[in-house]
Amino acid sequence: MMIICSDNIATNMIIDYLGLDTINACIRELGFGHTVLHNPLHFDRYDKLGTTTPRDYAALFAQVAKGTLVSKEASAAMLGIFRQQHYNTMLTHDFPQFYLDCEETGEPELIWVASKSGSMNACRNDGGIIHTPYGEYVIVLMNKEFHDIIEYNDPPAMVYGARVSRMILDQILACEGKLYLK
């Protein structure tokens, strides 16, 4: 529930059960040195809920994709959960639907996404693994100072993120997955 539906009640139940210190120790042990959970997810009570960086977020998804986060089995289970996540609009909104939706044909999806989004106050974030016919890549989009109302269609942060995500996908597909940075 806490990943697929972004249910903060489920998240807070885990926080209450394990405790912030235990969770933060695990985060550090996994190597995410710039990520901290400051408080339970009560938006009306706390100004600072958590801190992370694009690098830590990308490293998390890279390890899940490689099967090296905790174990191969745990990574595979996490990947399955991230693939079911409901709120991936920032990553997929501008993707051609014929890549993502093969329910009518019964064929496997050409592109699938395993991601986790989040928003708080003026921050809009999404990150995950994009699987293409040419391989997988990790993308993380973190926006701040977007004082839009996310309840309406196409808020600016989502539109901006979707455009960036589509530009990256187009380059991956055009180069058949062979992108080289010099």
Regions picked out by a protein language model, each given a short descriptive name:
Residues 9-10, 34-38, 87-92:
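Secretory-pathway/luminal and periplasmic proteins that interact with or process carbohydrate-rich
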Residues 12-69, 73:
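Mid-domain, small-residue-enriched loop/turn segments at the edges of structured enzyme/sensor domains
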Residues 6-7, 19:
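Membrane-embedded alpha-helical core segments of multi-pass
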Residues 60-99, 106-110, 117-182:
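Structured C-terminal helix/loop/strand segments within mature extracytoplasmic catalytic/sensor domains
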Residues 6, 41, 143-145:
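Short, histidine-centered active-site or binding-site loop motifs used for metal coordination
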